[in-house]
Amino acid sequence: MLGFYRTYTTPFEEKIPAFVDKFFSRVPIYKRFLRFFSRYVYTEISLRNSKKIETILPKHKRILWIQWVDAYLGDSLMDLSSRVFLSGRQVDLLTKEYTSRIYKGDTVFNRIFTNSDQCNPNDYDLLIIDSYRERSIKSFIGRLSHIPHASLFGYYNVDDFNRLYFSFYRINQLLSHPYNKQYIDDIAKPLLPITALDISVVEGFSLPDRFIAIVIGGVWKERTFHKWTDVIKDILFKGIVEKIVLIGSSDAKEESNLICRRYPNNVVSFVGECTFNQTAQIINKSILLICADGGLMHAANAVRTPVLGLFHELDPSVRLVKSNRSFGLMDKLCIDNISIKSIVTKVECLISDEE
């Protein structure tokens, strides 16, 4: 009824890592239908003057991509990286202030806005909107709601799925499939601009020649690993590398100071000292990134640095990509249950394979 299947079925034929049954077991069907029906009615009313587009044509040269609801850095990177398929068109971005900063100097996005009032509706012949959620539509309703639109996710509403592949396959579909699945699997990765200034700043850090980068701290309690000191101890004891660089946000400053005091000759910290993009350049200079699930894991995939990700409950396949050497370790109960031995063993394998 009304296309309810769209909430759990992808609009394209390619298969992506997605755990639909798990979502079904968690959320009863009546709740899922009521949520869909509410969004359906709101969308039909709010976008009644906006023609829904299922094919991006050559005439659609001026595009405003609106990415509003899922504004975490990792989600944003996964959702927007398929913009590489729109190169050659004028593409602007409307997103939240927090995420807008990482796209400065982008090779595809021309202008970046953080409020729909900044956008001139006469500048666009197509909107790409993230989804039909009410919050997303409210971000541009009014001056822009008469412009034809295409939706990335539409009504799709599943918790755990690989957003990056969804985005690439969906934009490829909207462009009438110029690329086959094998090509997309080979090239699909997060797209993150690293400017000449970012490179210059990081060059000034005089980083070691050969080092592992480790992200410490975390925003989410369930995604925060607390045994980095033990991991570092075993890495150094085994002689895997002699130098380790700590990165992350300022909330981990105290932890980084403790680790540096314990290993003053082997560990250096840039925790809380760099922008996201500058941190990505540090990762680019490393031979491996070790981290819990988070935005910097996607930065590693963007610069194609091998990555070992630690996950709580979430299957690594919904975050990792085929185009970069990445591996995940997961524990369903607690991320701290992932053994130090399994982490260090995988680090050895990833580095030996790289060499």
Q: Which residues fall in each region the model found?
A:
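Catalytic machinery of carbohydrate-active enzymes
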Residues: 2-355
